[in-house]
Design a protein with these regions (language model features):
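Short aromatic-glycine-(Arg/Gly/Cys) micro-motifs in beta-strand/loop hairpins
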Residues: 1-10, 30-31
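Residue-level detector of conserved, well-ordered beta-strand and adjacent loop positions
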Residues: 6, 16, 33, 136, ...
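Solvent-exposed strand-loop boundary residues in beta-sheet-rich modules
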Residues: 9, 36, 149-151
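Surface-exposed loop/edge segments in extracytoplasmic proteins
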Residues: 10-14, 41, 152-155
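A short, charged, amphipathic alpha-helix used as a generic interaction element across diverse proteins
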Residues: 15-34
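Short, mixed-charge low-complexity intrinsically disordered segments
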Residues: 29-45
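Conserved active-site-adjacent core of cysteine acyl-enzyme catalytic domains
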Residues: 46-166
Length: 166
């Protein structure tokens, strides 16, 4: 698809890669919209956000646990891990939920990803070779997340999170 960037009060350009559009919107204090004029990403986010009611699921790989946890939170009535074991990607697995549109982003900073949490969307972030976390909350100084390999709820300073995702 194509993404349109508005910043500094005017149209800044269009991009085919969402990551590029987010970077341009970030640099111009703007917003990214899709071809249907739906907001996809906003530079401005609230100073804190929290998504409650997320119950960690264990039993698979770190990624399977993360995707299953998010799918269950979103109301999936199927076994997400089973689909992933059949070769479905995380995004394909989430997109089977009615009204859900998962996206995959590579190379964006933690700060940019937090805009999604601020809009009420959980973020699965890769933190190592086979390690994933689910970001559930943030404030001005730290993020809260579920470590999907252990199910533990933890916090990390915004500074450390910035280093982890850079």
């Amino acid at each position: 698809g194509r993404y349109y960037v508005y910043g500094y009060g005017t149209f800044q350009g269009s991009k085919t890669q969402l990551e590029s559009a987010i970077t341009l919107a970030y640099d111009t204090y703007g917003t990214v919209v899709d071809c249907d004029s739906k907001s996809v990403w906003k530079r401005y986010r609230s100073t804190q956000a929290s998504i409650d009611g997320v119950s960690p699921v264990m039993g698979g790989s770190s990624l399977e646990n993360a995707v299953t946890t998010v799918c269950n939170y979103l109301g999936a009535d199927y076994n997400a891990a089973a689909y992933m074991e059949q070769g479905y990607t995380a995004v394909q697995t989430m997109n089977m939920i009615s009204g859900v549109h998962g996206i995959s982003l590579t190379g964006i900073t933690c700060e940019k990803a937090l805009s999604y949490v601020g809009e009420g969307s959980l973020v699965i972030a890769k933190t190592g070779e086979d390690e994933y976390i689910i970001i559930t909350a943030y404030n001005s100084s730290e993020i809260a997340y579920i470590e999907s390999s252990s199910g533990s709820v933890k916090t990390m300073s915004m500074n450390d999170a910035g280093k982890m995702f850079s």
